[in-house]
């Protein structure tokens, strides 16, 4: 229900304390309410690929959409708009007025921990995808919060690192997606990044925030990332409206003190409070549910399945190995991801899904008459798999005292698995700063043998099985990457177990502040977390041998493996581009035997090294596909969906080939963006370095022809009448399909060093066999402009510009040109 209040009246009549209270959150997810003036609290919620609601722990299940790079791989404005609508509806069901997304940072390195959250390495593609999903979300009444402005392109020391970037690269690459969003979508909120830009944290950097409000004439609510406010005076004066989360750390009484010292003006407080009230007024129009609920509807499942299938990129299909005929009699499914799909990355993307379809179940459904052989082949987990389906009667008890003391039970919560994240958990009487918990449950293994147990913790924890201590993770802790970079490495123990016998599992847990570990540059959300995993101990060589055996028996083999949220997550970056240990050996062994009938399906949010790619006939990139991961992959493998995804980022042969390789972590608190504007394909093309798969690459089960000459009209660029490129495209193959045509602009005669070409438009066209259509791609002023650092303005340089239309950045199929007759400078959007 819309809150009925007049902003001017409220601002003129509320107390100074109320004004100041508005400028920070009331708790982890809400803004402050002023009931006397009918100003309600506004609920915000993560995350980039689904709506978690207000609880990391014991939350309401949610729809899980494919990850950001998967959505970027669709190159589909309409699908992204539909995805935004679904996210908006999920927000409404969770009682949330404001979605904390989308993420539009740049994948300058394949190692970035949150690379999977963003859409693309190209700023134009990223901005257009963001615009589409924002407009979809905000059509439901929910406000979108585009993030993280700007330069949070890696996780290493993200709160402390000073990103050193030239003004030109900042404008042309890293700010451009936000600029497109400001021009085309103007969402209601913007979230600042944790890091510094050129010496000053963005959250308190007036030059950076003035770009948004003054240069782009866009006036969103500007909020901090969670615990990403570092000062009172500087952040207020720079333009930060809302410190999140609450309770405040840098506002409240500190603003009062700064006012008394005349370090913050009354007009500044009024301006920030007005912006929060305007945000509340707009957000409160969203018809949110009074309670957090689910909405797992058939039409949402169908959309999620379409999103997943359309995101899948067919990287190789030598000899038309795919699609696999549904008449196949015997098929081998190999890989850790076959029965345990990777549906999302970690961190803010984590949520409790309504369901997750595995590839195994999807293949069983698609091939009811086939014999299906399965072997894991090699484990791909970094942390042992959480105990869930073999767990029963599990609860967690909360106390303010450790287990060795007499203590009072404060709360009991049921749990469905042995992982918990308590950053936002609270209970009456619980001391959030220091508390203890005991998880107890019954574990019934399905296989006899020696079992491995692994315990990772942010805090301290000890594992007991039938009251025998199996793991002590309390005293000799080593920092790892889990839980936003605050957790320990996994401590491992073993125990001999019998199938069908029930064992008592007990975890004695101490909250975050019981841990002696300290770290710089990572976010301390508090509360604490733990992950207990378990699996049967297996000999790696025997696992590979078992996999090779079933591959030898099968007519076709599908190997599905890759990364998961253990490897790609907020809070840390990957150390290398490699697949998990043992995976390459598994794939190579299967290819040695059956390369002519084996398809490799990789799940990751960003590129991984594929040393066996030249020997594989069929390679599919399936990303993190959300709830419908298994269905989406199976739909493509068996030809129910003709693959149409295109890579939204370049796929290097080796991590050392990446332009950010020498500058991908904080060194002494600084990180130099030394590649300047030559990021991604711009770098590979400029230096002539080969990649494994180029930006924009993706194959189809059909073929297309495109007219070699693009008609560009008008031939002279005018800001009043910018040109449009038109080409004729025809489906020359046997099945219906979609082609994504990518428009690149080259300025070969420019006096200023520029990339060989840059993406400035694209279109996706669906055609039946034999159908042809003329498609148009519009060209805007960004296509001819670069940032002139001397004039501190955009410069559209006179000269002839080449129009290059391709099916990837390397496959140019049509050409045209236009000219700019007079150099001009401009600012704004």
UniProtKB/Swiss-Prot annotation:
Pathway: Glycan metabolism; cellulose degradation. Keywords: Carbohydrate metabolism, Cellulose degradation, Glycoprotein, Glycosidase, Hydrolase, Polysaccharide degradation, Secreted. It is found in: Secreted. It holds the Pfam family Glyco_hydro_3_C. One of its GO terms (molecular function) is beta-glucosidase activity. It is an enzyme of class 3 (hydrolase). It catalyses: Hydrolysis of terminal, non-reducing beta-D-glucosyl residues with release of beta-D-glucose. SUPFAM superfamilies: (Trans)glycosidases, Anthrax protective antigen, Beta-D-glucan exohydrolase, C-terminal domain. GO terms for biological process: cellulose catabolic process. The active site is at 225. One of its GO terms (cellular component) is extracellular region. Glycans are attached at residues 13, 304, 473, 602, 627, 664. Residues 389-548 form the PA14 domain. Its EC number is 3.2.1.21. Beta-glucosidases are one of a number of cellulolytic enzymes involved in the degradation of cellulosic biomass. Catalyzes the last step releasing glucose from the inhibitory cellobiose. Belongs to the glycosyl hydrolase 3 family. This is Probable beta-glucosidase H. The lineage of its organism: Eukaryota, Fungi, Dikarya, Ascomycota, Pezizomycotina.
